[in-house]
Amino acid sequence: MEPQDPVKREGRLTPVIVLATLIAAFGSSFQYGYNVATINSPSEFMKDFYNYTYYDRVGEYMNEFYLTLLWSVTVSMFPFGGFLGSLMVGPLVNNLGRKGTLLFNNIFSIVPALLMGFSDLAKSFEMIIVARVLVGICAGLSSNVVPMYLGELAPKNWRGALGVVPQLFITIGILVAQIFGLRSLLANEEGWPILLGLTGIPAVLQLLFLPFFPESPRYLLIQKKDEEAAKRALRRLRGWHDVDAEIEEILEEDRAEKAAGFISVLKLFKMRSLRWQVISIIVLMAGQQLSGVNAIYYYADQIYLSAGVKEDDVQYVTAGTGAVNVLITVCAIFVVELMGRRFLLLLGFSVCFTACCVLTGALAMQDVISWMPYVSIACVISYVIGHALGPSPIPALLVTEIFLQSSRPAAYMVAGTVHWLSNFTVGLVFPFIQVGLGAYSFVIFAVICFLTTVYIFLIIPETKSKTFIEINQIFIKMNKVPGVHPEKEELKEFPPSTARQ
């Protein structure tokens, strides 16, 4: 009898996959969202703390410029730390593994939680600034490693849904920070150190529970060359014993890029066979951050006030906007495998483009037409919905899908660097743009949304329900690499003698 091919099955959601996803996302992605929003509500109390601490040391209060500068540094240290964390992704995931990196990353959450929690007792605002760098590093690592880890755990028919879960927990983190940051809870003179210090709790829980779950089978098989460990991991993840078909698929990926070996960031940019993949992640990550999402939130309070919302009630409306963000991200989990990644990106950026255009007109005319502030509120909510559907969750998922194992860590380093530098740039530049252009500042974001939509329409293929090899073959045709067999797509860059080995 001829040997039969291994039986391929549709993957399913097992308790192991669900729990590993929830623990990784809560322990890591949640903190990213929490620390994005946690210093917004208590900012005035924290500035007072900075001032009183300075007075206790030198006998006089800070001038307005120095206080503003110190606060700007405090805020900007988070994206700066995120940038540093992105640079650490490649070395850590290659040496410690995906799960190992997430466990190591908890250091960058627990230590700053203690620093921020005890900063008031220690009378040191420097502890807060250092802590913001450290939680930024935590966010920079988690925003790249969690999607990579979950993407490599998931069966292909669930990869999209699980790939959106990290973004869901980011939005939940933002919402929880907004709720805890209500003035009646922790955004007050006594409560703000507790509000900042709570970020360490998810890290402690992840440190306790994640060790009981499998490492990425792809990492174990391709990089550690441990087939038995990979089989054990797959059996736990899939819930059945016969995993030979999936092992063979992973080995096929390994053979397809064996000659490539370790791919650095520099090598990533030089490889012709990865040209459109690299350009795509740069465009998507830059488009995600430069599309105006942070500016919308920055402007939201002013828009709510202009519509007649009382100043004390703005915090509740802001939390309501955060709840909408969570709800739509939950919807994205259920529709990403039905509608596909490409459709959600096109829909999301198109909604953001339309919202920015209408918001520009509404802000320009709100002093002339009485009901225009309500149009502005509708635009803010529409923008949040559009961004939560595609631009927020999908780019990180696509980085996992359009790169193979050897190039994935370097790709995440590039994606993370673009993400955090773009985030930092918007935070630094937007206040000046807003002063100079006023309502018309959103025209810039509308243009970026439009250009990103055009790029997605022309270049980005649909990746749902495809294996990593199948997706890579699509890009091989786009990159027009001559004479490369579909299973040797990344070998064009190497001498023939090497490729034949």
From Swiss-Prot:
Residues 1-18, 92-98, 150-161, 214-277, 335-342, 395-412, 461-501 are cytoplasmic. D-fructose binds at residues 32, 167, 288, 296-298, 387, 419-420. The modification N-acetylmethionine is found at residue 1. It is found in: Apical cell membrane; Cell membrane; Cell membrane, Sarcolemma. One of its GO terms (molecular function) is fructose transmembrane transporter activity. Residues 40-68, 120-126, 183-192, 299-313, 364-371, 434-439 are extracellular. Keywords: Acetylation, Cell membrane, Glycoprotein, Membrane, Sugar transport, Transmembrane, Transmembrane helix, Transport. The keyword ATP-binding does not apply. Glycans are attached at residue 51. It catalyses: D-fructose(out) = D-fructose(in). GO terms for biological process: cellular response to fructose stimulus; D-glucose import; dehydroascorbic acid transport. It holds the Pfam family Sugar_tr. SUPFAM superfamilies: MFS general substrate transporter. It comes from the Eukaryota. GO terms for cellular component: apical plasma membrane; plasma membrane; sarcolemma. The chain crosses the membrane at residues 19-39, 69-91, 99-119, 127-149, 162-182, 193-213, 278-298, 314-334, 343-363, 372-394, 413-433, 440-460. It is a multi-pass membrane protein. InterPro entries: Fru_transpt_5 (IPR002442), GLUT (IPR045263), MFS_dom (IPR020846), MFS_sugar_transport-like (IPR005828), MFS_trans_sf (IPR036259), Sugar/inositol_transpt (IPR003663), Sugar_transporter_CS (IPR005829). NCBIfam families: SP. Belongs to the major facilitator superfamily. Sugar transporter (TC 2.A.1.1) family. Glucose transporter subfamily. Functions as a fructose transporter that has only low activity with other monosaccharides. Can mediate the uptake of deoxyglucose, but with low efficiency. Essential for fructose uptake in the small intestine. Plays a role in the regulation of salt uptake and blood pressure in response to dietary fructose. Required for the development of high blood pressure in response to high dietary fructose intake. This is Solute carrier family 2, facilitated glucose transporter member 5. It comes from Ovis aries. The gene is SLC2A5.
